[in-house]
């Protein structure tokens, strides 16, 4: 359903944000 698609998109966005956060922390 649409909700599942939205959840997948949100998860993808969260993963991208998480990766960016980890990268920034690693840079410090």
From Swiss-Prot:
Location(s) in or outside the cell: Secreted
Pfam families found in the cross-reference section: Cu (PF17563)
Keywords: Amidation, Secreted, Toxin
UniProt-listed GO biological process terms: defense response to bacterium
Modification Glutamic acid 1-amide occurs at: 28
Superkingdom to which the source organism belongs: Eukaryota
Family annotation (InterPro entries): Cupiennin (IPR035164)
Family membership noted in the UniProt record: Belongs to the cationic peptide 04 (cupiennin) family. 01 subfamily.
Cellular component GO terms, alphabetical: extracellular region
Entry comment describing in which tissues the protein is expressed: Expressed by the venom gland.
Any one Gene Ontology molecular-function term assigned to this protein's record: toxin activity
Protein name: Short cationic peptide-1b
């Amino acid at each position: 359903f649409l909700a599942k698609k939205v959840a997948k998109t949100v998860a993808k966005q969260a993963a991208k944000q998480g990766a960016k956060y980890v990268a920034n922390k690693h840079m410090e």
